[in-house]
């Protein structure tokens, strides 16, 4: 027993000590340890020490959930609460819900990914320069699907019902006899009722509307008229008709109204079921529909109904008429008229696509072709446009060295003269356009292939003699990883002799300038060709070229060698040039320097054509001449002037 200053403790303190100890023991034996329990036990011990009350805690404590009074009443179980995800901050998703007073909702079920709903308006932008004829068939096919979707969703539902008629019903109609008196008529009606207080005795269908009436905007309503005999039990009566059109999946209610009093004890009520008023509902349930390829579609409707008779004076009793537990059934046949058939959306889509014809089935769609001889307008660029292309496939789409040259020959007794037309290279203008004639196709330079293999030689092939001369300065490139700037464009004067099977052409290029003005503008080429006969099989030819280009790298492409073609006035070939630099230098030393512009003569010796670098020149003037020869069908080139600075 503890003492305090030699005195005994008060009984209240003893009790508090005992209770706090027992509560501590009970809390330690429990399975749950939480700061909430410790704080609660501590506060209870202090309060018990002052008041002397005993407090007992449960073995398991639960966290108290607090809800805002403005929140919607939602019951959340422990299992559902564990599946809720924290609503992360997103600018696209509002953090407050307006229907709960603007309070923040801490939890939300992530059902939709709102990031998928975001779109860019740029996706709907179209190129104004696109070709309309290319998308003609696509737009024509899509028009049919668009109209079908419009009819399915009812956004532009433009069809009506016509030509309806009553096919069958299971009603046993009442046959009246006008010769009998009122007493006899009443007896006959009660006999027809067969102990019932309500019974349908007549069903009729409204007058149908024909297709011609609808075309003249004379619309009608498809209605079912019914007459009911009612036993006059009380003055206050209520008769309700319950009907369905899809075997009681959907139920509709209408009221019958007083029509007349047949006898003092029998009244007649009348009801109307308007089928036309339920048109949208029938469309949504696919009970009536239209075929897009037909003017009208026949649909069958099966209507079932029964009646209820409520009487006020008989303790609100209700009487039913369900046709002896069989319900009343009516089968109606009607025609759904497609009003879109007159003015179809396809005529709007295909108004600019030429005449078209659409068959009775969606499998047959015939469209007239455009005139094959008519040329489509292509995109054109201005002549001074710079073309820079860094694409790996640039050699397939860029043809800056594609020129058209037409050979115009004039037969003369002593002098033969041929002059090529002035041509300017306009990329993409003739990329898709076929040649006008066979002559243009022959003279137009086709493929221009230039590839570098191990930086030792070039493979150069062309189908035009003039183009090879114009671009001969490209052959200077070898072992130049990066072109260095030069002071002025080099002037190259070339003289060569071409040996072929049938004749030899000797030509001398007099003024070949590679003008690169202002960072190598787009390529332009001007060509003049003059030939004069020297001997029977030899002609003297002179070319004058002026060209500049900035896209030499776009013409580099590794390609196999092409065989040398037979020479002609319209189609010539240049053989593949392969040489090693060391052989060039050795041949250059052995051959020696000669005077420029020697006399042109055919060469029959066969030697490898050297490569012409500008770095191996030691003369101060920078001029020398190389005399080389090839076997027949190959080129012999004499090069006269070179500058040390490489040409790009």
Swiss-Prot record:
Regulates the activity of glycogen synthase. It is most probably a regulatory subunit for protein phosphatase type 1. Disulfide bonds: none annotated. GO terms for molecular function: glycogen binding; protein phosphatase 1 binding; protein phosphatase regulator activity. Residues 201-331 form the CBM21 domain. InterPro entries: CBM21_dom, CBM21_dom_sf, PP1_regulatory_subunit_3. Keywords: Glycogen biosynthesis. This is Serine/threonine-protein phosphatase 1 regulatory subunit PIG1. Residues 20-52, 593-629 are annotated as: Disordered. GO terms for cellular component: protein phosphatase type 1 complex. It comes from Saccharomyces cerevisiae (strain ATCC 204508 / S288c) (Baker's yeast). The gene is PIG1. The lineage of its organism: Eukaryota, Fungi, Dikarya, Ascomycota, Saccharomycotina. One of its GO terms (biological process) is regulation of glycogen biosynthetic process. The keyword Translocase does not apply. Residues 20-51 have a biased composition (Low complexity). Residues 593-609 have a biased composition (Polar residues).
């Amino acid at each position: 027993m503890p003492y305090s200053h030699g005195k005994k403790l008060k009984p209240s303190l003893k009790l508090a000590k005992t209770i706090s100890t027992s509560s501590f023991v009970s809390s330690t034996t429990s399975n749950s340890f939480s700061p909430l329990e410790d704080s609660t036990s501590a506060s209870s011990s202090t309060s018990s020490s002052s008041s002397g009350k005993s407090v007992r805690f449960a073995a398991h404590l639960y966290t108290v959930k607090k809800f805002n009074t403005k929140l919607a009443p939602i019951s959340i179980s422990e299992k559902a609460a564990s599946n809720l995800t924290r609503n992360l901050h997103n600018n696209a998703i509002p953090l407050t819900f307006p229907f709960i007073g603007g309070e923040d909702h801490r939890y939300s079920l992530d059902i939709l990914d709102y990031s998928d709903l975001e779109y860019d308006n740029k996706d709907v932008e179209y190129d104004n320069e696109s070709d309309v004829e290319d998308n003609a068939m696509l737009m024509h096919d899509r028009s049919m699907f668009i109209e079908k979707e419009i009819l399915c969703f009812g956004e532009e539902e433009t069809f009506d019902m016509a030509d309806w008629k009553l096919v069958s019903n299971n009603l046993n109609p009442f046959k009246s006899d006008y010769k009998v008196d009122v007493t006899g008529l009443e007896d006959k009606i009660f006999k027809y009722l067969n102990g019932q207080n309500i019974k349908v005795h007549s069903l009729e269908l409204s007058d149908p509307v024909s297709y011609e009436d609808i075309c003249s905007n004379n619309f009608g309503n498809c209605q079912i008229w019914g007459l009911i005999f009612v036993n006059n039990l009380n003055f206050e009566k209520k008769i309700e008709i319950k009907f369905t059109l899809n075997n009681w999946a959907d139920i509709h209610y209408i009221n019958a109204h007083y029509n007349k009093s047949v006898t003092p004890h029998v009244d007649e009520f009348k009801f109307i079921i308007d089928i036309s008023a339920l048109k949208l509902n029938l469309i949504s349930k696919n009970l009536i529909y239209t075929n897009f390829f037909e003017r009208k579609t026949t649909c069958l409707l099966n209507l079932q109904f029964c009646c209820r008779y409520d009487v006020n004076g008989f303790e609100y009793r209700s009487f039913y008429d369900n046709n002896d537990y069989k319900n009343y059934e009516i089968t109606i046949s009607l025609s759904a008229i497609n009003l879109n058939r007159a003015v179809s959306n396809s005529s709007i889509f295909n108004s600019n696509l030429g005449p078209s014809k659409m068959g009775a089935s969606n499998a047959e769609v015939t469209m007239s072709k455009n005139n094959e001889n008519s040329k489509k307008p292509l995109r054109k660029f201005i002549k001074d446009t710079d073309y820079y292309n860094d694409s790996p496939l640039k050699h397939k789409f860029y043809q800056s060295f594609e020129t058209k040259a037409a050979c115009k020959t004039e037969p003369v007794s002593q002098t033969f003269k041929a002059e090529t037309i002035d041509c300017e290279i306009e990329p993409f203008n003739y990329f898709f356009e076929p040649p006008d004639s066979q002559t243009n196709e022959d003279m137009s330079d086709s493929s221009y292939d230039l590839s570098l293999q191990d930086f030792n030689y070039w493979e150069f092939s062309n189908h035009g003699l003039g183009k090879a001369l114009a671009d001969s300065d490209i052959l200077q490139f070898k072992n130049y990883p990066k072109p260095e700037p030069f002071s002025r464009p080099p002037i190259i004067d070339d003289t060569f002799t071409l040996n072929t099977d049938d004749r030899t052409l000797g030509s001398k290029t007099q003024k070949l300038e590679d003008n690169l003005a202002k960072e190598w503008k787009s390529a332009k080429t001007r060509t003049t060709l003059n030939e004069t006969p020297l001997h029977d099989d030899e002609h003297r030819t002179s070319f004058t070229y002026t060209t500049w280009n900035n896209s030499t790298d776009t013409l580099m492409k590794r390609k196999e060698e092409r065989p040398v073609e037979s020479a002609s006035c319209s189609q010539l070939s240049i053989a593949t040039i392969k040489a090693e630099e060391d052989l060039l230098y050795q041949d250059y030393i052995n051959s020696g320097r000669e005077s420029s512009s020697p006399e042109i003569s055919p060469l029959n010796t066969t030697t490898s054509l050297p490569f012409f670098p500008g770095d191996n020149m030691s003369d101060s003037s920078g001029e020398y001449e190389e005399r080389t020869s090839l076997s027949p069908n190959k080129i012999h080139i004499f090069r006269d002037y070179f500058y040390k600075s490489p040409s790009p």
